[in-house]
Regions:
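Non-catalytic interaction/regulatory segments
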Residues: 1-96, 100-309, 317-328
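Conduit-forming functional cores of very large proteins
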Residues: 84, 341, 353
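Short glycine/proline-enriched loop/turn "hinge" motifs that connect secondary-structure elements
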Residues: 112-114, 340-343
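Phosphate-interacting basic helix/loop segments used at nucleotide- and nucleic-acid interfaces
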Residues: 332-336, 340
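Conserved small/polar residues in nucleotide/adenosyl-binding loops
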Residues: 356-358
Length: 358
C-alpha cells in the first residue's frame, strides 16, 4: 500500500506539471525512484521528440551529488535498447570512462496511443586535468556524439581533442583529415601515433587548427590575416621547443608544414541548406610539402570524408585524366602517382599539332 501511495503521488505530481492534453508517461517504480517528476517533466521535449520519430536524443548533465570529475549522460532511443558495444567505444573516444549505466523503458501515452522508447542513463568519469564546464562543453559534446552516432564523423580517438584541446567536432575533422593526408604523403608514423601526439600536446593541436582557420577565414582582412599567422607561427615554434621527443616534434612540424602548404579549402563553404559541407577538400602546393616523394605534381587536391577519400594530382594548369577506384587504402596516392607518371610519358610522345581531313 505504501509503495502504491508513493507511485500515485509521483504520477499525480507529474500530471500537475503537464499542460492539459499533453502526453503522459507510463513508467515503472525503478524510473520513479531514479528521477523526480520535475526531472521527468524537464525531459519531456526529448522524450516526445523521440517517441514521435527522432532516432535519438541525448543530454549531458551533472547530478547534484556528482563531483566535477563526474558526469552523466541520458540517451533517449526510439528503436529498442542500444548495445553497450555501440555506446561505450563512442564515449571512450570522446575521452570519458563509463562507470555505470541504467536502462529504463518509457511509455509515452497520447490519447489511446502508447509509444515506447528507451532511456539509457550513463555515469561517466571526466578525463584528468579537464575542468568540464557544461555550459561550454555540453553543446560540443552533444554535437560530437550525434555526429558519430549518425556516421557523419569517424569514431576514433581524435575525438578526445574536443575536451583536451577545446575544439568542436568539425575542427577535429580538419586535424583528422590532415593526418589522413600525411599518411598518403609518406609520413612514417601511424594514425594512432599522430592522434596520441596531438592529445599529448593539446595546446599545440589547438594552435595548429587556429593556424588553418586564420589562413582561410573569409572574414579576416589580409593585413589581419598575415599578422595573425605570424603570431601563431611564433607561438607554435615556442611551444615546439618544449617537445622533447623527436618523433613527436617531427609529427607536429609536418602538421604545420601541411597547413602552410595549403592553398585553398572548402572548410568555410556551405551547402544549399546552409550547412557545412560533408566532405573536406584541401588544395596543396606540393613544392612546399616536406617529405613528399618525387616527382612532385604542380598541384594536389586531397578530399576526405567518413566513407571516401582521395587525391587529385595534376602536373600542369591544364591537365586531363579520369577517376579511379583504389583498394589500396594505406597508399593509394602511390598508385595514383604511378598512373600520372605513365600519362606523362604518353603525353611526351603525342604530336601536339595535327591535321584533319574530310
Amino acid at each position: 500500500q505504501a509503495v502504491g501511495d508513493i507511485a500515485a503521488r509521483w504520477i499525480d505530481h507529474f500530471v500537475m506539471l503537464s499542460p492539459v492534453g499533453a502526453p503522459v508517461l507510463d513508467v515503472d517504480q525503478a524510473y520513479q525512484e531514479a528521477f523526480t517528476p520535475d526531472e521527468a517533466f524537464a525531459d519531456m521535449a526529448d522524450i516526445v521528440a523521440t517517441a514521435e520519430g527522432e532516432p535519438v536524443r541525448i543530454e549531458f548533465y551533472r547530478r547534484d551529488d556528482q563531483s566535477e570529475d563526474q558526469l552523466s549522460l541520458k540517451i533517449f532511443h526510439r528503436d529498442g535498447h542500444l548495445p553497450l558495444s555501440r555506446r561505450v567505444p563512442l564515449l571512450e573516444n570522446l575521452g570519458f570512462g563509463v562507470t555505470s549505466e541504467r536502462t529504463f523503458d518509457i511509455g509515452v501515452v497520447s490519447g489511446e496511443t502508447t509509444r515506447t522508447i528507451v532511456l539509457h542513463d550513463m555515469e561517466l568519469n571526466v578525463p584528468k586535468d579537464v575542468k568540464l564546464d557544461l555550459a561550454v562543453y555540453g553543446p560540443r559534446l552533444e554535437e560530437a556524439f550525434l555526429a558519430v552516432f549518425h556516421g557523419s564523423v569517424d569514431n576514433d580517438n581524435f575525438n578526445r581533442l574536443i575536451l583536451a584541446a577545446g575544439l568542436n567536432v568539425r575542427d577535429v575533422s580538419v586535424l583528422r583529415a590532415y593526418a589522413r593526408y600525411l599518411r598518403q604523403s609518406g609520413i612514417v608514423y601511424s594514425q594512432e601515433h599522430i592522434s596520441e601526439t596531438l592529445f599529448k600536446y593539446p595546446a599545440i593541436a589547438a594552435k595548429i587548427f587556429e593556424l588553418f582557420a586564420s589562413g582561410f577565414d573569409p572574414k579576416l582582412g589580409e593585413k589581419s590575416r598575415l599578422r595573425k599567422l605570424s603570431d601563431l607561427h611564433k607561438e607554435i615554434e615556442t611551444a615546439l621547443g618544449g617537445v622533447p621527443n623527436l618523433d613527436e616534434d617531427r609529427t607536429l612540424r609536418r602538421y604545420v608544414n601541411a597547413v602552410d602548404s595549403t592553398l585553398r579549402t572548402n572548410y568555410f563553404q556551405r551547402d544549399a541548406n546552409g550547412l557545412p559541407k560533408a566532405m573536406l577538400a584541401f588544395k596543396f602546393d606540393p613544392k612546399l610539402l616536406d617529405g613528399l616523394p618525387d616527382p612532385r605534381p604542380f598541384r594536389e587536391i586531397f578530399v576526405y570524408g567518413t566513407e571516401v577519400e582521395g587525391v587529385h594530382l595534376r602536373f600542369g594548369k591544364v591537365a586531363r585524366g579520369g577517376l579511379r577506384w583504389s583498394d589500396r587504402g594505406q597508399d593509394y596516392r602511390t598508385e595514383v602517382l604511378g598512373l600520372v607518371k605513365a600519362q606523362q610519358v604518353k603525353n611526351a610522345v603525342i604530336v601536339q599539332i595535327g591535321r584533319a581531313h574530310v
